[in-house]
Amino acid sequence: MKALLILGLLLLSVAVQGKTFKRCELAKTLKNLGLAGYKGVSLANWMCLAKGESNYNTQAKNYNPGSKSTDYGIFQINSKWWCNDGKTPKAVNGCGVSCSALLKDDITQAVACAKKIVSQQGITAWVAWKNKCRNRDLTSYVKGCGV
């Protein structure tokens, strides 16, 4: 009985961790979801952004005390402007999506929201892109992935 309880807890912890993509797996997924070259942003730039924001982890979540908002998912999409978490004051929900949807292993909704953000504000909407990706050689993010 004790072994079943421990097994159950282990399985629960695995389920809560979410998916951390391998580099080439994410590159292929983002390409298949139409991000390669979307609004002039290369796949390598999207990969660098995802690495800098979440380390390719779909469950990444970071609270911002100043704005009382939270960043969600692989692209760290903010609850003040882009998604609804039910607790951020004066949230806009520009993507019309629940923030919990941005934490799913299936990143289709996260990509759709990222497309909306980049369409309206450009890739510079993400601080991690400005700090870690802009004006850098990003070829290593897609090298050897066959994309």
Curated annotation (Swiss-Prot):
C-type lysozyme domain boundaries: 19-147
Active site: E53, D71
MF (Gene Ontology): lysozyme activity
EC number in record: 3.2.1.17
Biological process annotations from GO: defense response to Gram-negative bacterium; defense response to Gram-positive bacterium; killing of cells of another organism
Reactions it catalyzes: Hydrolysis of (1->4)-beta-linkages between N-acetylmuramic acid and N-acetyl-D-glucosamine residues in a peptidoglycan and between N-acetyl-D-glucosamine residues in chitodextrins
Signal peptide: 1-18
Disulfide bonds: C24-C145, C48-C133, C83-C99, C95-C113
Superkingdom in the source lineage: Eukaryota
Assembly information from the UniProt record: Monomer.
Job description of the protein: Lysozymes have primarily a bacteriolytic function; those in tissues and body fluids are associated with the monocyte-macrophage system and enhance the activity of immunoagents.
Stated family: Belongs to the glycosyl hydrolase 22 family.
Something else known: Lysozyme C is capable of both hydrolysis and transglycosylation; it also shows a slight esterase activity. It acts rapidly on both peptide-substituted and unsubstituted peptidoglycan, and slowly on chitin oligosaccharides. The ruminant gastric lysozymes, which digest symbiotic bacteria coming with cud from the rumen, are much more resistant to inactivation by pepsin than are other lysozymes.
Protein name, per record: Lysozyme C, tracheal isozyme
Species the sequence originates in: Bos taurus
